[in-house]
A protein has these predicted regions:
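Glycine-rich phosphate/cofactor-binding loops in nucleotide/flavin-utilizing enzymes
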Residues: 2-7, 79, 346-396
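A short, Trp-centered hydrophobic/proline-enriched beta-strand micro-motif
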Residues: 123-132, 173
Length: 396
């Protein structure tokens, strides 16, 4: 057996193990009534976080230096997909997974310092990510700014769509910084406590993904402690590029799980529901929709697995970029289409809270925007494919 085949077998066993422990946790902790309540309350109770971190699942949201899982990234993608499938909703543990992904891109000393600080704070290595700004599509056009005067270092600006921004004690702020960020082209990262004077948080009433509790955070001349700056040593651009790829895998794994949940609900309804004296699953038009949905779900699974394995196996950087871009271009949109067809098959009840498919559609739709919109992915895909072709022609 070749090395790649051995890795694939090992990954298959690991994925199956992760899926089993997710199923066990969901059987014990997650019900449809609880999901509905948590959506209304914009998050899960603290007791549920404790239960998650005390279970075997908790180690997948922790870095190795904090006792977390030290293995291929595909295991974390499998966890996200299975959890979203079982819940039929976007669970807030996704924020913790994104924190872990971003932390893994930092230098080891920074990882250790941040992990120790956060673990002592609330037992979780989690921070919100204050990167997005209203109307600012490119990170290079960020307007949040760090300034320095005789009184110290100060932060001013507004960030939006900060997942769990009101509830996680620290937020990682991406900002213009012409003094401390010169090595990175005038930008820097700061891990800021949200209870500091001058920090204000406000809820965002999004149409989906309620348990992520998105927020707007305003920084009004917040005095910064120099120790809060993340030391990037001129490698911030590479760090963020890596984080985007890991984050996109997690987002697409979430989309995959949501689409699988919609498919599960459709198959059950087709097998049990009778319409005008006919079994729903026996109607040719419904069969066509089910077949189309199955193809999309299968393709999504393949793309997510390919991208996650590319990262896990340490493929060359260009291959990782291509696999992640192809995945992000296709998966979120396909998930939304699957959920939309599920809603159509359910009919009127699908447009109410009596069925999960409506909220699944709303959650899927948000993932077409998160971690890079659908529209920007073709640029990366085409560029990488043409580059690979040009390289082969030169070698030939």
């Amino acid at each position: 057996m070749h090395a790649n085949e051995m890795r694939e077998c090992a990954h298959d066993d690991l994925v199956e193990h992760v899926q089993n422990i997710v199923d066990k946790f969901c059987d014990e902790r997650i019900t449809e009534d609880r999901i509905r309540q948590w959506r209304i309350s914009r998050g899960v109770p603290e007791a549920e976080y404790r239960a998650f971190y005390e279970s075997e699942l908790g180690k997948y949201c922790l870095p190795p230096m904090a006792g977390g899982f030290d293995g291929p990234f595909i295991a974390r993608a499998a966890l996200v997909a299975r959890l979203m499938r079982r819940a039929g909703a976007t669970m807030p543990y996704l924020t913790d997974m994104n924190s872990m992904a971003l932390l893994s891109t930092m230098r080891i000393l920074s990882q250790q310092e941040i992990a120790e600080d956060l673990m002592s704070c609330n037992g979780r290595v989690a921070f919100s990510q204050a990167f997005s700004e209203g109307g600012q599509g490119e990170s290079g056009s960020v307007t949040t700014e760090v300034t320095v005067d005789e009184g110290g270092i100060f932060l001013d600006g507004v960030k939006t769509f900060v997942a769990n921004g009101q509830y996680i004690p620290r937020t990682l702020v991406y900002t213009r910084d012409m003094v401390n960020g010169t090595a990175d082209g005038g930008v820097s990262l700061w891990l800021v406590p949200i209870d500091e004077p001058g920090v204000s948080t406000f809820p965002l009433n999004t149409v989906g993904q309620e348990m992520l509790a998105p927020a707007r955070i305003e920084f009004e001349h917040v005095k910064l402690n120099p120790d809060w700056q993340i030391q990037t040593e001129g490698k911030l651009s590479q760090m963020l590029e890596r984080q985007y790829e890991l984050g996109r895998i997690l987002i697409c794994a979430s989309s995959l799980g949501l689409a699988q949940a919609a498919m599960d609900d459709v198959l059950e309804r087709c097998a049990t529901h009778v319409s005008h004296g006919r079994n729903l699953g026996g109607i040719p038009q419904i069969q066509q929709k089910v077949a189309d949905m199955a193809v999309r779900v299968r393709a999504m699974d393949m793309l997510v697995t390919r991208a996650a394995e590319s990262i896990s196996n340490g493929a060359d950087a260009d291959q990782q970029h291509l696999d992640c871009a192809l995945m992000k271009y296709y998966v979120p949109k396909a998930a939304t289409e699957v959920a939309s067809e599920a809603l159509q098959i359910f009919g009127g009840v699908g447009y109410t809270d009596d069925a999960r498919v409506g909220r699944i559609w709303r959650d899927c739709r948000g993932n077409q925007i998160a971690q890079g919109t659908d529209e920007i992915m073709p640029h990366t895909v085409a560029k990488m494919l043409i580059k690979n072709c040009a390289s082969r022609l030169v070698d030939f």
